[in-house]
């Protein structure tokens, strides 16, 4: 149903939810685009902190700090995913070059890819167009959000929801992807989207009278399944 290999395990869970939903309705609203439109991902503000980290801490101490940070996470079954994410983040920060490029490189850094891919495969870098689009300018949260819109949102999440929902004859619509909303948030100052550590700040402020505070401040949970 995907017409090509699709390495997003959350497609399985999405299909189950779509199948259950179809038993009650024929059209459903999704939250797709909420993080890209309103700045809901941790990597957005972490990207801004990267410059401070690499300039304050001398380069010779980067590896020491990285090893110490990852050692704080024990490798128990329930912490293994967190340890992997921490290692990935620290490698991205510590790696020479573009931090955000390293974060979106599917879990592997350039030096790792060179070790296990033949040169012919490595030459065809699917993310090369990203560097060409953004260039070497200082990136803003809006730049990060636009990258995700073209890469993960259009190429993964929307494909996943469309294929799995239509397989159950359920029609899904994504109100957050209204063009006017996207254009509006692109014109806002960054602190309207990420205020300190508060992600999707303006969205929470707009609906705080309708939802309890604990609901608005719940931690993010992925939808992937163990594969």
Predicted regions and their residues:
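Short Ser/Thr-interspersed hydrophobic loop/turn segments at strand-loop and sheet-helix junctions
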Residues: 21, 149-163, 185
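ATP-dependent adenylate-handling active sites, centered on carboxylate activation for C-N bond formation
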Residues: 1-124, 164-209
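A short, charged helix-loop
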Residues: 123-134
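A ubiquitous short alpha-helical element
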Residues: 151, 168-172, 225-227
């Amino acid at each position: 149903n995907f017409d090509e290999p699709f390495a997003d395990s959350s497609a399985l869970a999405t299909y189950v939810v779509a199948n259950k939903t179809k038993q009650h309705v024929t059209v459903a609203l999704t939250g797709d685009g909420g993080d890209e439109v309103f700045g809901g991902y941790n990597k957005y503000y972490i990207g801004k902190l990267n410059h401070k980290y690499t300039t304050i801490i001398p380069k010779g101490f980067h590896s020491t700090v990285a090893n110490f940070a990852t050692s704080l996470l024990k490798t128990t079954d329930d912490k293994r995913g967190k340890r992997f994410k921490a290692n990935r983040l620290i490698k991205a920060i510590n790696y020479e070059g573009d931090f955000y490029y390293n974060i979106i490189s599917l879990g592997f850094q350039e030096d790792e890819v060179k070790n296990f891919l033949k040169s012919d495969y490595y030459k065809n870098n699917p993310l090369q167009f990203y560097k060409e689009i953004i260039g070497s300018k200082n990136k803003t949260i809006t730049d990060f959000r636009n990258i995700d819109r073209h890469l993960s949102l259009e190429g993964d999440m929307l494909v996943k929801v469309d294929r799995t929902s239509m397989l159950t004859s359920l029609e899904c619509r994504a109100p957050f992807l209204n063009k006017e909303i996207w254009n509006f948030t692109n014109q806002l100052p960054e602190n309207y989207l990420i205020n300190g550590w508060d992600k999707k700040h303006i969205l929470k402020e707009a609906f705080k009278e309708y939802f309890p505070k604990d609901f608005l401040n719940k931690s993010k949970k992925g939808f992937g399944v163990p594969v």
